[in-house]
């Protein structure tokens, strides 16, 4: 039995969906512990491309329980669309469970998110406009709506009376947005509650029953370490905690229940939205990485910013999450390059630093210090064993493992399930150096 957390070691979009899908084959329970529809993951099965925002990747395995935990925020309209899409693709959704205590994104959250971001002007932070920040803000202010409220007409009316009046006043008087019809909102969300009711459970009871039965539990994070509310590039962050510690809070488990933490990182770096990005590229190489990597956001459709692999934020992710091993994705995107650069340190105010600065202003002034490695200039897409990889590709992976000071367990070479080299099963295999310098 092993309980494993999968986190993003960069700014999100690292390929966690594919890695979680891969590991879900060995999991009895998959738990999404934070975030909302601001995250997206793509799973490719044969010719099927499934783009999900809320539903855990493990939904493709009929015997696996997929739990959306208390730390998430739920947009029921989006969730029901995803469920309908899965049913249309003949995917069994009976294993999906939703925490009754998860908070709900209401229509006023989306409207406020968009209005506030627009008002920020050139100080915008790059929000997805999906209402995530305002939903978490209401949660912190103890003014939020939870899934269980959608199951009781009287309770929902009582819970919404004050917030709806307050939000309508804000929308109308501050942002010039038309107010919402209270009765229409209530009826709409009661309808969502009726459809979701068969999936609503006590999250804590589900997880701890699985733990007592010595089941394998996989905790799936959204976004990435550098978007963490407390430990990311604040204020250019999300409104929750994607790091491994967030699994304990969002799922309701103690840290002693976690056996292993796996970090997912691209073989290069990407970022969506605003904020400093020291290794960001411009010109033809940026275009090449973006086009070959299909770097467009699953949630927003925005073109991702691309840059070289950043070992400084990588080491930071190892430390903050307590990573045991890494999964490196999209190695194949680098196949055509004659040389590849890796950031090993920064220069800040004329001094070399090897740590991640805590202020966004200092981070924006950091200049990357690179080491240049030779490329392999041949396709890796069909490699299925380490020994199939070109020597220079192996050297690159060893360099990353040495730089990050953590072994590599999985190498992904494309979107399909079979385009993967599993050096050692991270769930059942022993903790040992899998691919290291």
Curated annotation (Swiss-Prot):
Report one GO cellular component.
Answer: cytoplasm
Task: Identify the keywords attached in UniProt to this record, alphabetized.
Answer: Cytoplasm, GTP-binding, Ligase, Magnesium, Metal-binding, Nucleotide-binding, Purine biosynthesis
A GO molecular-function annotation = magnesium ion binding
**Residue sites binding Mg(2+) per the record:** 13, 40
Q: Please list the residues that bind IMP.
A: 13-16, 38-41, 128, 142, 223, 238, 302
Q: What is its EC number?
A: 6.3.4.4
Tell me the route in metabolism or biology where this protein functions.
Purine metabolism; AMP biosynthesis via de novo pathway; AMP from IMP: step 1/2
Kindly identify the residues recorded as the active site: 13, 41
Return the Pfam families for the record.
Adenylsucc_synt
Q: Cofactor note from UniProt?
A: Binds 1 Mg(2+) ion per subunit.
SMART domains in the record = Adenylsucc_synt
Cite the binding residues for GTP.
Answer: 12-18, 40-42, 304, 330-332, 412-414
- From the UniProt record, give one GO term of the biological process aspect: IMP metabolic process
- Which residues of the sequence carry a binding annotation for substrate? 298-304
* Annotated InterPro entries: Adenylosuccin_syn_GTP-bd, Adenylosuccin_syn_Lys_AS, Adenylosuccinate_synth_dom1, Adenylosuccinate_synth_dom2, Adenylosuccinate_synth_dom3, Adenylosuccinate_synthetase, P-loop_NTPase
Which residues are the signal sequence here? Answer: none
| HAMAP family the record matches | Adenylosucc_synth
**UniProt family annotation:** Belongs to the adenylosuccinate synthetase family.
Q: How does it assemble?
A: Homodimer.
Say what the protein does: Plays an important role in the de novo pathway of purine nucleotide biosynthesis. Catalyzes the first committed step in the biosynthesis of AMP from IMP.
Protein name (Swiss-Prot/TrEMBL): Adenylosuccinate synthetase
Taxonomically, what lineage is the organism? Bacteria, Bacillati, Cyanobacteriota, Cyanophyceae, Synechococcales
């Amino acid at each position: 039995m092993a309980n494993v957390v999968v986190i993003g070691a960069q700014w999100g979009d690292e390929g966690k969906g594919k890695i979680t899908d891969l590991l879900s084959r060995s999991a009895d329970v998959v738990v999404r512990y934070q975030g909302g529809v601001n995250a997206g993951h793509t799973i490719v099965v044969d010719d099927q491309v499934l783009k999900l925002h809320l539903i855990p990747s493990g939904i493709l395995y009929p015997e696996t329980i997929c739990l959306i935990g208390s730390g998430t925020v739920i947009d029921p309209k989006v969730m029901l669309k995803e469920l309908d899409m899965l049913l249309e693709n003949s995917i069994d959704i009976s294993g999906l469970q939703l925490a009754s205590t998860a908070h709900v994104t209401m229509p006023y959250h989306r409207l406020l998110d968009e209005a506030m971001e627009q008002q920020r002007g050139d100080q915008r932070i790059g929000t997805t406009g999906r209402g995530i920040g305002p939903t978490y803000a209401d949660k912190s202010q103890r003014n939020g709506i939870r899934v269980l409220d959608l199951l009781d007409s009287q309770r929902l009316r009582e819970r919404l009376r004050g917030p709806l009046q307050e939000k309508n006043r804000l929308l109308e008087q501050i942002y010039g947005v038309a107010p919402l019809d209270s009765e229409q909102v209530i009826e709409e969300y009661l309808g969502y509650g009726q459809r979701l009711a068969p999936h609503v459970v006590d999250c804590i009871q589900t997880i701890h029953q699985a733990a007592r039965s010595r089941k394998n539990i996989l905790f799936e994070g959204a976004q990435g370490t550098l978007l963490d509310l407390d430990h990311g590039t604040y204020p250019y962050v999300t409104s929750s905690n994607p790091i491994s510690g967030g699994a304990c809070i969002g799922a309701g488990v103690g840290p002693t229940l976690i056996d292993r933490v796996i970090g997912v990182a691209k073989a290069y770096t990407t970022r969506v939205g605003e904020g400093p990005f020291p290794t960001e590229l411009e010109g033809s190489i940026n275009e090449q990485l973006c086009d070959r990597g299909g770097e467009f956001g699953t949630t927003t459709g925005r073109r991702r910013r691309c840059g070289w692999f950043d070992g400084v934020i990588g080491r930071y992710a190892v430390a903050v999450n307590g990573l045991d091993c890494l999964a490196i994705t999209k190695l194949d995107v680098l196949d055509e390059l004659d040389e590849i650069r890796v950031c090993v340190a920064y220069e800040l105010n004329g001094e070399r630093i090897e740590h991640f600065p805590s202020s966004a202003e200092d981070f924006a002034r950091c200049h990357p210090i690179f080491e240049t490695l030779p490329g392999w200039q041949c396709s890796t897409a069909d490699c299925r064993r380490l020994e199939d990889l070109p020597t220079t590709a192996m050297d690159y992976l060893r360099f990353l493992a040495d730089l990050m000071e953590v072994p590599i367990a999985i190498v992904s070479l494309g979107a399909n399930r079979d385009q993967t080299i599993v050096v050692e099963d991270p769930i059942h295999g022993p903790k040992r150096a899998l691919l290291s310098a």
